[in-house]
A protein has these predicted regions:
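Short loop/turn microsegments at loop-to-beta-strand junctions
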Residues: 2, 14, 66, 136-137
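ATP-binding/phosphotransfer module of carbohydrate and carboxylate kinases, centering on a glycine-rich
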Residues: 1-61, 72-74, 97-100, 118-124, ...
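Phosphate-binding/catalytic loop of phosphoryl-transfer enzymes
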Residues: 9, 21, 61-63, 69-172, ...
Length: 298
């Protein structure tokens, strides 16, 4: 059976795994990602060099999941998120020449969708989507049984969606800031007066699960906003199912509140007075959480 080296490049760490062709993880670890504010592309490639050298004689190829708008055919990065030093580079081609083996590159949100479509919560669907609640809101879209990338590789870049038409010049008006995990932290901090950076998913849901009424109220505000965008996404694409991913999606309380918020949206739609039918999105959790990008990249 053939083995591959798969990277999931994030802003803080780059995870990697030795995987077989059935996406079974044989070994897994991570290395720090060089800071884009002080480091260069060559610094990042040097980090990859160290990992590749470790597995060079055991792999048939390399697959990479990374942020940004990119062309999966050659790995050209229009943007690269927190790996800004890779923007404008044809990463797939460059690394293939560097290591002498095939290298594929795909957007991280699209990798999550591919993983769920291959072996997870979207398996067997014709039209579906993944919404990943991370630092921002990422994801991917499956249409007619295939990953939909769009003409400019931006399909599924939900963070760019404007959610407040009255304030399009403010960052808080975009889905990426107000509905990612950081968005939830910002909502809570706004009402407590604390620095939002003191809140992470574990702290927020620790308080929520302990019955903190203030945190529960802010969680409801967060899921109300998220539910509206999920409703809109389903209206645009008429999907079989929408899978919610990201670290905080592992919290049962989030799914409970999100489903409740979505039910309220559907119950209160005034269009029911005109038409008895209103499209109702079906949501579920992603099957693969932290490993989704690794599996989808393969």
């Amino acid at each position: 059976m053939k083995n591959y080296l798969v990277f999931d490049a994030g802003g803080t760490f780059t995870k990697y795994a030795l995987m077989d062709e059935n996406a079974e993880i044989l070994e897994k670890d991570k290395v720090p990602t060089p800071d884009y504010r002080t480091k260069t592309k060559e610094d990042y490639y040097a980090v990859l060099d160290g990992v590749v050298e470790k597995y060079r004689n055991r792999i048939e190829g390399i697959a990479i999941s990374m942020p940004g708008m990119l062309d999966n055919k050659d790995g050209y990065c229009v943007t690269a998120g927190y790996l800004a030093y890779l923007a404008g580079s044809t990463v797939g081609t460059e690394l293939s020449k560097r290591y002498g083996i095939p290298v594929s590159v795909e957007n991280d949100g699209k990798c999550a969708a591919l993983a769920e479509f291959w072996r997870g919560s979207l398996k067997g669907c014709t039209n579906g989507a993944v919404v990943v609640l991370g630092s921002g809101v990422a994801g991917g879209i499956i249409l007619n049984g295939k990953l939909f990338r769009g003409n400019h590789f931006t399909a599924g870049e939900y963070s760019y969606v404007c959610t407040d038409a009255k304030k399009p010049a403010e960052m808080e008006s975009y889905w990426g800031l107000n509905s990612g995990a950081e968005g939830l932290a910002r909502i809570i901090a706004k009402h407590t007066g604390e620095n939002w950076q003191t809140y992470d998913g574990l702290k927020i849901f620790g308080l929520a699960n302990d019955g903190d009424e203030k945190v529960l109220a802010e969680l409801k505000e967060y899921t109300d906003s998220l539910a509206v965008q999920i409703y809109n996404l389903n209206i645009y694409l008429d999907l079989d199912i929408i899978a919610i991913g990201g670290g905080i999606s592992q919290q049962p309380l989030l799914h409970k509140y999100l489903q409740r918020s979505l039910d309220e949206v559907l119950e209160n739609i005034p269009l029911r007075k005109i038409s008895p039918y209103v499209p109702e999105p079906k949501i579920t959790n992603c099957r693969f959480y932290n490993d989704a990008n690794l599996i989808g990249a393969l």
